[in-house]
Amino acid sequence: MDVWFYRFIRPIIKAFFYIVFRPTVKYKENVPKKGRIIIASNHTDYFDCVALVATNKRTIHFLAKDELLKGVLGPGFKAMGIIPVNRREKDKNALPAALKVLEEDKVIGIFPEGTFKKDIDGLLPFKIGAVKMAHDSKSRIIPVAVVGKFRPFRKGITIVYGKPYKIESD
């Protein structure tokens, strides 16, 4: 999957993110420079994806609701390697597409909560997809915590990269 647009847009995203949100980033060295990994982050806002792209040198192929690829930004999302997920019915295409990316020793980005709700503090229940993907592809999972609120021109957002781990048993 060629993601030429990702290489073009990442510096713009990074500059925007660091200027506007002034994040604190911890332990980004936990992301290996190569090899298949799944970045699994909590989901607090649409800017979570921007945060991960801006604070990470690897190209991340996010799983995202298919509605995002239908709007005006859809062509850009497609060019960045977004994998669409049909959440209205059991999606039979997203997991094989993600596994193919991992077979190429690339990076999948997933939000195990599946969505976010602005009116809820804390985590929503996790879905099993990230663990199943890690098990089936023998990939490592890197947990990421996005802590705080995305408030323009104020400090307050922290991105913490956890240590990679592997799912060892069935």
Region spans (language model):
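A short, well-structured juxtamembrane/interface segment
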Residues: A15-G35
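Helix-adjacent hinge/juxtasegments
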Residues: M80-G109
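Catalytic core of membrane glycerolipid acyltransferases/transacylases, capturing the structured
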Residues: F5, Y18, K33-E89
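A cross-family acyltransferase "interaction/gating" segment
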Residues: K118-D170
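Short, basic, glycine/proline-bearing loop/turn elements
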Residues: I12-I13, A79-V85, E113-K118
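N-terminal membrane-anchoring alpha-helices
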Residues: M1-R22
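Hydrophobic/aromatic ligand-binding patch that stacks against planar heteroaromatic rings
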Residues: L52, G76, K100, K132-A134
